[in-house]
Amino acid sequence: RSRADALGLMTAGSAVAAVASTAVAAATVWTAQTSATRLARFAPFGLRTGAASYLLGIAAWDFIYYWNHRLAHESRWLWAVHVVHHSSERYNLSTALRQPVAEGVTMAVPYGLLALLGVPPRYVEDARAINLIYQFWIHTEAVRSIGWLEKILNTPSHHRAHHGSQRQYLDINHGSILIVWDKLFGTFEPEVERVRYGLTRNIDTFNLGTIATHEWRDIAADIATAPTWSDRFGFLLRGPGWAYERRDELAPAALEPVSEPVAG
């Protein structure tokens, strides 16, 4: 095919992906917002409007986001969604926009929990927007440090470490606005060694379908070849680190020749 044909296919594919992503994202946001409004009716108490409630909503969203994000790294079926964001081997503002379509579904968790806690739905939506906007600017190598605020906030430095593929940078710094959650729950690690971005095993492709589904396909393959039910559940539910190490442990056994019985 000519270069023009290839460019045309890439453009068409990107357009289709953009339209589909927008439609799914809009649907999930609408669902989350609607569920928050309805769940708020069942809250045992309602917070008053005002600055204190507004700030509480932001802090509560950030706290729930921390656990949501942490689980996305520690459970492989959630990692299969989130891995899209981490598959970039570059780190800049565009990386912040590299988001999986299916991750929008997880927004129902903070929306629903905050609504049940009595946070006004409009405050919940504002908390989400502030959280999302804050995450955008920390995807940069241009800002090395912001001084004493590094102790409190999630910063470009902390988030660069989060995107690292070296062992010391795996499964750390899950906070969005505040880094204090990581310090409280033992998942904080400062940026020391220069970060190598991407996955521990990069996929080396720009194919959108492969980027979005490669981990799901790997999970299916691992489950299909797993020797025990314990391994099958592990490949789906345990962390990706365990899954990759277990796959490597099983690979030599799968390659060993079957011994023939000795005639006698």
Model-derived features: positions:
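Membrane-interface helix termini and inter-helical loops of multi-pass transporters
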Residues: 33-45
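A broad "ordered helical/assembly scaffold" signature
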Residues: 23-26, 34, 47, 51, ...
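Cytosolic-facing loops and C-terminal tails of multi-pass membrane proteins
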Residues: 194-264
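Hydrophobic alpha-helical topogenic segments used for membrane insertion/localization
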Residues: 7-36, 50-63, 109, 113, ...
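Membrane-embedded catalytic scaffold of the fatty acid hydroxylase/desaturase
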Residues: 47-201
